[in-house]
């Protein structure tokens, strides 16, 4: 898409409004220019356009859609920012900054609780936006992957809803769980592991307990996996680990068992976002996992409050023109 010939814009030219079905073609055109055409945006448009909380917005410049952002209400008091995109032809004018400020301000005016988002360590522009709008970087993860192991799991067994109390008690004692912000990860989004989410995962058969031979009835480790419903290639399902935790001495063995479980479930590969701590990464490496990227994943968070943190005011942003 070609920019406007004069490349000069005023505040009156820009409008941020709720996205509409008629915007689909423009949004797909923007997505086609991002990540070598592998942007996930086209795959979630239907869900986002039907968001019951109306958190899907586009930025238009002289009636042309040039940017997009999504505010997702994950639960009561739990908000997630995602989908910030600007047409490459219009980058460099501050539109991404305006969209980010708009999204933060919108949540502050209409919500409460915690607002979070994730981004790549290479995205310095978004990191600057995070700092100026009162976010803190609360955790760092590294994407790892491994081939499956075609042998039975040694000590993993599915857990049931009846196990929820002992799982919660075990998690509440886990320093790793606290460092992971008490959250599950699924395709770059993080969800607080509430009792309701734990119950849903248990009912779906997505939670496994790990017990060593010397304590067959005790919980020594925990593995929570994601379903395959978001897989891009359903015929080649990947075991995406939402959360994996064990004592440092058991972590490598549990990660090995996760690879075995993947084969048992008919998955072709295993992926996990591992907490960026030396002992954690070493344990995964010993279990055959390797880095899939040189870039880290940063998790940012801030409280939703009209008085806390940075002041976010659209009328204080810089002019749009160069």
Model region roles, listed by residue range:
Residues 73, 118-119, 136-150, 290-304:
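Conserved catalytic-core motifs of GNAT/GCN5-like acyltransferases
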């Amino acid at each position: 898409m070609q920019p406007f010939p004069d490349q000069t814009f005023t505040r009156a030219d820009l409008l941020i409004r709720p996205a509409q079905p008629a915007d689909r073609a423009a949004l797909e055109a923007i997505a086609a220019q991002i990540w070598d055409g592998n942007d996930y945006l086209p795959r979630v448009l239907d869900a986002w356009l039907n968001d019951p909380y109306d958190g899907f917005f586009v930025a238009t410049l002289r009636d042309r859609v040039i940017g997009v952002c999504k505010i997702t209400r994950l639960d009561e008091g739990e908000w997630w920012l995602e989908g910030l995109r600007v047409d490459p032809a219009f980058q460099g004018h501050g539109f991404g900054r305006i969209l980010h400020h708009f999204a933060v301000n919108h949540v502050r005016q209409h919500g409460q609780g915690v607002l979070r988002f994730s981004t790549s360590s290479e995205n310095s522009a978004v990191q600057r936006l995070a700092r100026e709008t009162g976010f803190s970087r609360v955790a760092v993860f590294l994407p790892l992957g491994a081939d499956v192991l075609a042998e039975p799991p040694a000590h993993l067994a599915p857990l049931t809803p009846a196990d929820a109390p002992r799982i919660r008690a075990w998690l509440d004692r886990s320093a790793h769980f606290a460092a992971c912000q008490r959250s599950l990860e699924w395709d770059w989004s993080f969800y607080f592991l509430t009792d309701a989410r734990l119950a849903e995962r248990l009912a779906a058969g997505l939670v496994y307990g790990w017990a060593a031979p010397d304590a067959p009835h005790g919980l020594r480790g925990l593995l929570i996996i994601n379903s395959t419903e978001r897989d891009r290639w359903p015929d080649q399902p990947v075991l995406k680990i939402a959360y994996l935790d064990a004592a440092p001495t058991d972590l490598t063995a549990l990660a090995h068992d996760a690879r075995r479980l993947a084969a048992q479930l008919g998955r072709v590969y295993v992926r996990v976002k591992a907490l960026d701590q030396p002992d954690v990464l070493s344990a995964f490496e010993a279990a055959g996992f390797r880095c899939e990227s040189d870039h880290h994943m940063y998790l940012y968070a801030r409280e939703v409050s009209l008085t806390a943190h940075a002041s976010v005011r659209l009328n204080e942003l810089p002019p749009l023109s160069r």
